[in-house]
A protein has these predicted regions:
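Sec-dependent bacterial lipoprotein signal peptides
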Residues: 1-20
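Sec-dependent signal peptide cleavage junction
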Residues: 19-35
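N-terminal capping segments
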Residues: 49-146, 267-293
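Internal, charge-rich low-complexity segments
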Residues: 82-101, 204-231
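...with weaker cross-activation on analogous glycine-rich loops/strands in unrelated enzymes
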Residues: 147-226
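Low-complexity, Gly/Ser/Thr/Pro-rich intrinsically disordered linker/tail segments
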Residues: 224-293
Length: 293
């Protein structure tokens, strides 16, 4: 952790750097919140492959888009953003929570100990209390691919996650400049952040899931002029209905449209990652109906 402090001191010399160890400018949403930056370029890309027992035999049937989305939903409404959450003490890979099946009870208790005034700047490296963006996705992937605790994890630099996962043969990688559409389940990596696409609305806004201050939440991209979009409306509607306490504390659902132009993409290969219910063809409305109704 001494290296973290040194990194912070150096970063003060830049105009907008946060304690990310490599001086990157933060990605902000329309509220001024900062997406996860703890998983910076300095983080080790601990890109492990699924264990043998999850690559062969009956267990393969459990590795599916349905399971991935089910896991992605579980921390919603009760998991706060913590810089370094999901990482280990050495800050070079997955921590205990990110290689454990099911949500950590500590995430919910920490949420209950806090209120609308929660500020993630005050809880940096309380790694057991919540999740940052790559810790969140690493936990989701672990719970999708693995069937017991304590195996090698999937937490790594958020910036590299889409490309690294595609490199495992899990899907197709597309550079940010070439991305033209956003389907359910797409893993999207931008500088200092990673998020999960949940499909494209009629107005071309994109619904998404990510861990970004104040926590794990549904969001939508704004319109070009910064106005509210259909995706933002859906994120608010379903959060308010299903997580009213969260909505009462943190009623923020919009992210800048540049999420779309700045993010590379990994689209799951449905030949090896089952999509029996055709989630990739669903609209955000259809998906949310499946997830919550």
């Amino acid at each position: 952790m001494k290296k973290k402090v040194i990194g912070y001191i150096l970063s003060v010399a830049t105009s907008i750097c946060l304690l990310n160890g490599c001086g990157k400018a933060p990605d902000t949403d329309n509220t001024g919140n900062l997406p996860s930056q703890s998983d910076s370029q300095k983080h080790s890309e601990a890109s492990q492959r699924p264990s043998e027992e999850t690559q062969s035999g009956d267990d393969v049937d459990a590795i599916s888009m349905e399971k991935f989305l089910h896991n992605a939903k579980m921390p919603l409404g009760s998991t706060l953003y913590v810089w370094g959450g999901g990482w280990n003490e050495a800050d070079d890979g997955a921590g205990t929570e990110a290689v454990t099946l099911g949500p950590s009870p500590r995430w919910k208790s920490f949420y209950e100990e806090n209120d609308a005034s929660y500020d993630y700047h005050d809880t940096k490296y309380q790694i057991h209390d919540g999740l940052d963006c790559s810790g969140y996705l690493g936990w989701v992937v672990y719970n999708t691919f693995e069937n017991e605790n304590g195996k090698a994890g999937y937490v790594m630099s958020s910036t590299q996650m889409a490309e690294a996962f595609a490199g495992k043969g899990w899907g197709t990688y597309t550079a940010a400049s070439e991305v033209t559409d956003w389907k359910v389940g797409d893993v999207m990596s931008m500088k200092g952040h990673v998020w999960i696409a949940l499909g494209t609305c009629d107005d071309q806004s994109v619904l998404l899931l990510h861990a970004s201050p104040p926590g794990v939440r549904l969001c939508g991209t704004l319109m070009e002029d910064g106005s509210e979009s259909k995706a933002v409306e859906l994120a608010r509607k379903y959060t308010k209905a299903n997580y009213p306490d969260w909505h009462g504390r943190y009623p923020s659902y919009g992210v800048d449209r540049n999420y779309l132009s700045r993010s590379s993409q990994m689209r799951w290969n449905t030949e090896t990652f089952s999509d029996a219910l055709s989630f990739q063809s669903m609209t955000p409305e259809e998906l949310l109906g499946w997830m919550f109704d």
